[in-house]
Regions:
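Long, acidic (Asp/Glu-rich), low-complexity accessory segments flanking structured domains
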Residues: 22, 28, 70, 168-180
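Short glycine/proline-rich turn/loop motifs
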Residues: 171-188, 206-207, 321-324
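Active-site-proximal helices and loops of the catalytic beta/alpha 8
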Residues: 11-14, 18-29, 44-50, 54, ...
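Classical eukaryotic N-terminal signal peptides for Sec-dependent ER targeting/secretion
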Residues: 1-9
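Core domains of carbohydrate- and sulfate-ester-processing enzymes
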Residues: 128-178
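Boundary/entry segment of secreted carbohydrate-active catalytic domains
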Residues: 18-40, 180-184
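Alpha-helical scaffold elements lining the catalytic groove of polysaccharide deacetylases
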Residues: 187-199
Length: 514
């Protein structure tokens, strides 16, 4: 019995450690460089992410995937593995290793999007139409490069007529049947667990800091626990001995289904999809929502416990209307609202925060649905992903949006670092859509999302002095390229924000003091 208790405590310790993102140098926020090439991510870590205080990068799935030509090379083909070879349109294994090393060397962690619930779609055919030529047969459920055979899939367990998930009210179906026709791995099999763990461990040994685990709702927590338990500790070249991989699990839980996020809390952090969905309705002022209602933002809004949450305004799915949140999600297509919503997230202490970095595509709406939501990254005619060019004004070209480079978002990533560990404090609101709050005595932010001007004197909790607003500009030598905010010896400051300003919010922090 005593040994059992010790073993249970050890397992609990392992999973508790999997909630830690292992960020370095006081950095806090990660960015999802969606569909970027490994060579571009390596360069971005060195030239921009590290100097700007970003903590890490979520990368697109690095495994080999099926090539889909109809529609032409969609983004979602990356979520249909055909082998665990580290070869994708983002680059080969050598380029992946180079990126991981170069980012780690400047203190930027790499988190891998791990697709382990399934292989490609059942209708994927047979042949070598994988990104790097690996042969597979979706018809016969054979993936010899790994190898998986028909014995390694869940078809015998699924009890629906189609073999697909038909009813999200049935937890067995959601976990044992095919998600949109994708061949569902039998993760209760020790052999399958071993192959998945081998794939994750190869990446851990290369130096990644952890994983965003795709489609966790569709896997049994016990199976995931068994796989995570086989993961190696992080590479001691860059991480302290005994560090466990950071795990954040994609579970879409907006309520109303039998499977809940809570079932996965003990295994690592979980994506809080309610966060971006609610923040979107608040900033859009839909359904009578007001910014003033966010005084209790976080657990007070029915979100998961803070220590379990990975938060984001939008992600690669729901910015296209997939996943969760619907039309309320605020994306780069609404830049003014998006900057405000991301700033609110980065200023607020709840959760580990992730910033989205997107690519543009030609939207084509028919009856409210984007017919082009499948479109892949900017690419050449042969399907090869284009590099990310950096313009002279530090924005990106060729269809890459690079929200993480927008001044307002980049400077709020720094704000989050500066105020890290400080309590939410000095709340003010006008009972409508003007609010302000601080983080201890290290930072203060003011929002005006009303259709009229804000003109108010507030207690910032900050030491007296002149501060540079990091939204309209930033410190430049001894000066400031944006608004100057004067804080008196009593901590009070006067704020004026016109509802017609380019950005209707202001933020100051300890390191923006002149």
């Amino acid at each position: 019995m005593h040994l059992f208790i010790l073993a249970a405590a050890a397992l609990l310790g392992l999973s508790a450690a999997q909630h830690n993102p292992h960020t370095k140098h006081g950095r806090t926020a990660m960015v999802h460089l969606f569909e970027w090439r490994w060579a571009d991510i390596a360069a971005e870590c060195e030239r921009f992410l590290a100097p700007s205080g970003y903590a890490g990068v979520q990368i697109s799935p690095p495994h080999e995937n099926i090539v889909i030509n109809s529609p032409w090379r969609p983004w979602w083909e990356r979520y249909q593995p055909t082998s665990y070879n580290l070869c994708s349109r983002s680059g080969n294994e050598h380029e992946l290793r180079d990126m991981i090393s170069r980012c780690n060397n400047v203190g930027v962690n790499i988190y891998v999007d791990a697709v382990v619930n399934h292989m490609c779609g059942a209708s994927g055919g047979e042949g070598s139409h994988s990104v790097c030529g690996s042969w597979f047969s979706a018809n016969r459920k054979e993936f010899p490069t790994i190898p998986f055979t028909h014995w390694d899939f869940n078809d015998h367990k699924c009890r629906t007529g189609s073999g697909n998930i038909e009813n999200y009210g049935d937890a067995d179906q959601v976990r044992d049947c095919r998600l949109v026709g994708l061949l569902d791995l039998a993760m209760e099999k020790d052999y399958v667990r071993g192959k998945v763990a081998d794939y994750l461990n190869k990446l851990i040994d290369m130096g990644v800091a952890g994983f965003r685990v795709d489609a966790c709702k569709h896997m049994w927590p016990g199976d995931l626990s068994a796989v995570y338990g086989r993961m190696h500790n992080l590479n001691t070249t860059w991480f302290s001995g005994g560090s466990r991989p950071f795990v954040f699990q994609e579970v879409i839980d907006l309520g109303g289904e039998p499977i809940t996020s809570r079932e996965y809390f003990h295994l690592g952090r979980v994506t809080e999809f309610k966060y971006g969905a609610k923040l979107g309705t608040i900033f859009r002022k839909w359904n009578g929502e007001k910014l003033s209602y966010t005084k209790s933002w976080g657990e007070g809004w029915g979100f998961m416990p803070e220590g379990n949450a990975l938060v984001f305004v939008d992600n690669h799915d729901n910015q296209r209307g997939h996943g969760a949140g619907g039309a309320s999600i605020v994306t780069f297509w609404d830049p003014k609202l998006h900057k405000m919503a991301v700033a609110y997230m980065l200023a607020h202490p709840y959760g580990v925060a992730r910033v989205m970095s997107s690519f543009r595509w030609d939207r084509h709406f028919v009856n409210g649905k984007d017919q082009n939501d499948w479109m892949g990254p900017p690419s050449h005619g042969n399907g090869v992903t284009k590099p990310v060019p950096i313009n002279s004004d530090q924005t990106c070209g060729d269809g890459w949006v690079c929200e993480h480079r927008w001044r307002q978002i980049k400077n709020m990533a720094v704000f989050r670092n500066v105020v890290n560990g400080q309590p939410h404090a000095n709340w003010w609101d006008n009972q409508s859509n003007q609010v302000a709050f601080g983080r201890g005595n290290r930072g203060f932010i003011v929002f005006n999302n009303d259709d009229w001007n804000l003109d108010v004197t507030l207690n910032t909790g900050m030491p007296g002095g002149a501060y540079c607003d990091v939204i309209s500009g930033q410190k430049d030598g001894g000066g400031c390229t944006g608004k100057l905010i004067q804080v008196g010896g009593d901590g009070r400051a006067h704020f004026k924000i016109s509802n017609r300003d380019e950005d209707t919010f202001v933020a100051i922090h300890a390191e923006s003091k002149l």
